[in-house]
Amino acid sequence: MGTEFNGLFDEWAHTYDSFVQGEDIQYKEVFAHYEDILEDVVNKSFGHVLEFGVGTGNLTNKLLLAGRTVYGIEPSREMRMIAKEKLPKEFSITEGDFLSFEVPNSIDTIVSTYAFHHLTDDEKNVAIAKYSQLLNKGGKIVFADTIFADQDAYDKTVEAAKQRGFHQLANDLQTEYYTRIPVMQTIFENNGFHVTFTRLNHFVWVMEATKQ
Protein backbone atom coordinates (compact mmCIF):
# COMPACT_ATOMS: atom_id res chain seq x y z
CA MET A 1 0.00 0.00 0.00
CA GLY A 2 1.55 3.23 -1.13
CA THR A 3 0.19 6.75 -0.90
CA GLU A 4 -2.33 6.37 -3.73
CA PHE A 5 -5.30 6.42 -1.34
CA ASN A 6 -4.18 9.37 0.79
CA GLY A 7 -5.99 11.93 -1.35
CA LEU A 8 -9.21 9.93 -1.01
CA PHE A 9 -8.76 9.69 2.76
CA ASP A 10 -8.17 13.44 3.05
CA GLU A 11 -11.30 14.19 1.00
CA TRP A 12 -13.38 11.72 2.99
CA ALA A 13 -12.18 12.88 6.42
CA HIS A 14 -14.80 15.59 6.94
CA THR A 15 -17.76 13.42 5.84
CA TYR A 16 -16.67 10.03 7.17
CA ASP A 17 -18.70 10.18 10.37
CA SER A 18 -21.89 10.95 8.44
CA PHE A 19 -21.18 7.88 6.26
CA VAL A 20 -20.88 5.57 9.25
CA GLN A 21 -24.15 6.94 10.63
CA GLY A 22 -25.90 5.74 7.48
CA GLU A 23 -26.62 9.13 5.93
CA ASP A 24 -25.44 8.00 2.48
CA ILE A 25 -28.04 5.54 1.16
CA GLN A 26 -25.52 3.68 -1.02
CA TYR A 27 -23.33 2.84 1.97
CA LYS A 28 -26.04 2.41 4.60
CA GLU A 29 -25.81 -1.40 4.50
CA VAL A 30 -22.00 -1.29 4.55
CA PHE A 31 -22.11 0.54 7.87
CA ALA A 32 -25.14 -1.26 9.33
CA HIS A 33 -24.58 -2.12 13.02
CA TYR A 34 -21.45 0.06 12.96
CA GLU A 35 -21.26 0.56 16.72
CA ASP A 36 -21.74 -3.17 17.31
CA ILE A 37 -18.93 -3.93 14.87
CA LEU A 38 -16.56 -1.62 16.73
CA GLU A 39 -17.59 -3.12 20.07
CA ASP A 40 -16.96 -6.62 18.75
CA VAL A 41 -13.42 -5.68 17.72
CA VAL A 42 -12.81 -4.10 21.13
CA ASN A 43 -14.15 -7.16 22.96
CA LYS A 44 -11.87 -9.48 20.98
CA SER A 45 -8.78 -7.34 21.68
CA PHE A 46 -6.56 -7.32 24.76
CA GLY A 47 -3.53 -5.60 26.23
CA HIS A 48 -1.35 -3.38 24.07
CA VAL A 49 -3.20 -2.69 20.82
CA LEU A 50 -1.74 -1.55 17.50
CA GLU A 51 -4.50 0.06 15.41
CA PHE A 52 -4.14 0.60 11.67
CA GLY A 53 -6.33 3.21 10.01
CA VAL A 54 -7.38 5.24 13.03
CA GLY A 55 -9.48 7.42 10.73
CA THR A 56 -11.57 9.83 12.79
CA GLY A 57 -10.88 7.91 15.99
CA ASN A 58 -14.13 6.03 16.52
CA LEU A 59 -12.60 2.63 17.28
CA THR A 60 -9.67 4.23 19.09
CA ASN A 61 -11.99 5.96 21.53
CA LYS A 62 -13.76 2.70 22.38
CA LEU A 63 -10.45 0.90 22.86
CA LEU A 64 -9.22 3.59 25.24
CA LEU A 65 -12.49 3.55 27.20
CA ALA A 66 -12.10 -0.23 27.55
CA GLY A 67 -8.69 0.28 29.15
CA ARG A 68 -6.52 -0.80 26.25
CA THR A 69 -3.12 0.79 25.61
CA VAL A 70 -3.39 1.94 21.99
CA TYR A 71 -0.77 2.82 19.38
CA GLY A 72 -2.54 4.52 16.48
CA ILE A 73 -1.37 4.50 12.85
CA GLU A 74 -3.05 6.67 10.19
CA PRO A 75 -1.73 7.79 6.75
CA SER A 76 -4.10 10.73 6.22
CA ARG A 77 -3.17 14.10 7.69
CA GLU A 78 -6.80 15.27 7.62
CA MET A 79 -8.01 12.13 9.39
CA ARG A 80 -5.31 12.54 12.06
CA MET A 81 -6.36 16.13 12.67
CA ILE A 82 -10.03 15.21 13.15
CA ALA A 83 -9.20 12.23 15.36
CA LYS A 84 -6.99 14.37 17.60
CA GLU A 85 -9.93 16.71 18.21
CA LYS A 86 -12.05 13.77 19.44
CA LEU A 87 -9.45 11.84 21.46
CA PRO A 88 -7.62 12.66 24.72
CA LYS A 89 -4.97 15.34 24.29
CA GLU A 90 -2.18 13.03 25.42
CA PHE A 91 -3.00 10.44 22.74
CA SER A 92 -0.66 10.56 19.75
CA ILE A 93 -1.26 9.20 16.25
CA THR A 94 1.69 8.19 14.09
CA GLU A 95 1.80 8.58 10.31
CA GLY A 96 2.05 5.21 8.58
CA ASP A 97 0.07 2.39 7.00
CA PHE A 98 -0.36 -1.40 7.10
CA LEU A 99 3.07 -2.04 5.58
CA SER A 100 5.16 0.90 6.73
CA PHE A 101 4.91 1.90 10.37
CA GLU A 102 6.84 2.50 13.57
CA VAL A 103 6.81 -0.70 15.62
CA PRO A 104 5.80 -0.27 19.29
CA ASN A 105 7.80 -2.01 22.01
CA SER A 106 4.93 -4.32 22.92
CA ILE A 107 1.96 -5.59 20.88
CA ASP A 108 -0.72 -8.03 22.02
CA THR A 109 -3.45 -7.28 19.46
CA ILE A 110 -3.47 -5.70 16.00
CA VAL A 111 -6.81 -4.19 14.98
CA SER A 112 -8.39 -2.37 12.05
CA THR A 113 -11.87 -1.59 10.76
CA TYR A 114 -12.97 -0.79 7.21
CA ALA A 115 -9.43 -0.45 5.85
CA PHE A 116 -7.63 -3.71 4.99
CA HIS A 117 -9.25 -3.72 1.52
CA HIS A 118 -6.84 -0.97 0.47
CA LEU A 119 -4.19 -3.69 0.12
CA THR A 120 -3.99 -6.17 -2.75
CA ASP A 121 -4.10 -9.84 -1.77
CA ASP A 122 -0.33 -10.06 -2.23
CA GLU A 123 0.12 -7.03 0.04
CA LYS A 124 -2.25 -8.56 2.58
CA ASN A 125 0.00 -11.61 2.70
CA VAL A 126 3.10 -9.46 3.19
CA ALA A 127 1.35 -7.57 5.99
CA ILE A 128 0.14 -10.68 7.83
CA ALA A 129 3.60 -12.26 7.54
CA LYS A 130 5.06 -9.13 9.12
CA TYR A 131 2.52 -9.12 11.94
CA SER A 132 3.23 -12.79 12.61
CA GLN A 133 6.82 -11.84 13.40
CA LEU A 134 5.68 -9.10 15.79
CA LEU A 135 3.15 -11.11 17.81
CA ASN A 136 3.92 -13.69 20.46
CA LYS A 137 1.98 -16.95 20.76
CA GLY A 138 -1.59 -16.06 21.73
CA GLY A 139 -1.34 -12.62 20.16
CA LYS A 140 -4.24 -11.63 17.94
CA ILE A 141 -5.22 -9.86 14.76
CA VAL A 142 -8.80 -8.58 14.76
CA PHE A 143 -9.87 -6.95 11.50
CA ALA A 144 -13.39 -5.93 10.49
CA ASP A 145 -13.81 -5.27 6.79
CA THR A 146 -15.90 -5.95 3.71
CA ILE A 147 -14.98 -9.40 2.40
CA PHE A 148 -16.95 -12.06 0.57
CA ALA A 149 -17.61 -15.74 1.24
CA ASP A 150 -16.72 -16.59 -2.36
CA GLN A 151 -16.67 -15.22 -5.91
CA ASP A 152 -20.40 -15.86 -6.37
CA ALA A 153 -21.26 -13.77 -3.30
CA TYR A 154 -19.09 -10.95 -4.63
CA ASP A 155 -20.63 -11.07 -8.12
CA LYS A 156 -24.16 -11.02 -6.73
CA THR A 157 -23.40 -8.05 -4.46
CA VAL A 158 -21.93 -6.01 -7.31
CA GLU A 159 -24.88 -6.82 -9.56
CA ALA A 160 -27.36 -5.93 -6.81
CA ALA A 161 -25.67 -2.56 -6.32
CA LYS A 162 -25.93 -1.83 -10.04
CA GLN A 163 -29.59 -2.89 -10.14
CA ARG A 164 -30.38 -0.49 -7.29
CA GLY A 165 -28.60 2.37 -9.04
CA PHE A 166 -25.80 2.39 -6.46
CA HIS A 167 -23.12 3.05 -9.07
CA GLN A 168 -20.63 4.61 -6.66
CA LEU A 169 -20.82 1.54 -4.42
CA ALA A 170 -20.53 -0.82 -7.41
CA ASN A 171 -17.48 1.07 -8.65
CA ASP A 172 -15.94 0.95 -5.18
CA LEU A 173 -16.46 -2.81 -4.99
CA GLN A 174 -14.83 -3.26 -8.40
CA THR A 175 -11.83 -0.95 -7.96
CA GLU A 176 -10.63 -1.64 -4.42
CA TYR A 177 -9.31 -4.97 -3.21
CA TYR A 178 -12.20 -6.68 -1.43
CA THR A 179 -11.00 -10.23 -0.93
CA ARG A 180 -12.61 -13.64 -0.38
CA ILE A 181 -12.68 -15.67 2.84
CA PRO A 182 -10.73 -18.67 1.40
CA VAL A 183 -7.93 -16.30 0.38
CA MET A 184 -7.69 -14.78 3.85
CA GLN A 185 -7.94 -18.16 5.55
CA THR A 186 -4.97 -19.41 3.53
CA ILE A 187 -2.96 -16.27 4.25
CA PHE A 188 -3.54 -16.49 7.99
CA GLU A 189 -2.92 -20.24 8.25
CA ASN A 190 0.26 -20.06 6.16
CA ASN A 191 1.58 -17.44 8.57
CA GLY A 192 0.91 -19.40 11.74
CA PHE A 193 -2.56 -18.22 12.78
CA HIS A 194 -5.83 -19.94 13.60
CA VAL A 195 -8.59 -17.75 12.18
CA THR A 196 -12.37 -17.48 12.46
CA PHE A 197 -14.75 -15.31 10.43
CA THR A 198 -17.95 -13.80 11.86
CA ARG A 199 -20.43 -11.95 9.67
CA LEU A 200 -21.87 -8.78 11.24
CA ASN A 201 -23.76 -7.30 8.28
CA HIS A 202 -24.22 -8.05 4.58
CA PHE A 203 -20.75 -6.69 3.79
CA VAL A 204 -18.61 -6.79 6.92
CA TRP A 205 -17.00 -9.80 8.54
CA VAL A 206 -14.76 -9.81 11.61
CA MET A 207 -11.57 -11.81 11.16
CA GLU A 208 -10.15 -13.00 14.48
CA ALA A 209 -6.74 -14.62 14.06
CA THR A 210 -4.73 -16.02 16.97
CA LYS A 211 -0.99 -16.71 16.71
CA GLN A 212 -0.24 -20.38 17.30
From Swiss-Prot:
The set of disulfide-linked cysteines is: none
Keywords (A to Z) from UniProt:
Methyltransferase, S-adenosyl-L-methionine, Transferase
A GO molecular function annotation here is: S-adenosylmethionine-dependent methyltransferase activity
Q: Is Nucleotide-binding set as a keyword in this record?
A: no
Enzyme class, one word? transferase
What start and end residues bound the annotated signal peptide?
A: none
- Which one Pfam family would you cite for this protein? Methyltransf_25
Q: What are the recorded Gene Ontology BP terms? A: methylation
Which EC numbers characterise this protein's activity in its record? 2.1.1.-
Residues annotated as binding S-adenosyl-L-methionine are G53, E74, D97
Q: Which family does it belong to?
A: Belongs to the methyltransferase superfamily. YrrT family.
Q: Which PANTHER family match?
A: TRANS-ACONITATE 2-METHYLTRANSFERASE (PTHR43861:SF1), TRANS-ACONITATE 2-METHYLTRANSFERASE-RELATED (PTHR43861)
What does this chain do? Answer: Could be a S-adenosyl-L-methionine-dependent methyltransferase.
Q: What is this protein called?
A: Uncharacterized methyltransferase BALH_3960
Q: Which organism is it from?
A: Bacillus thuringiensis (strain Al Hakam)
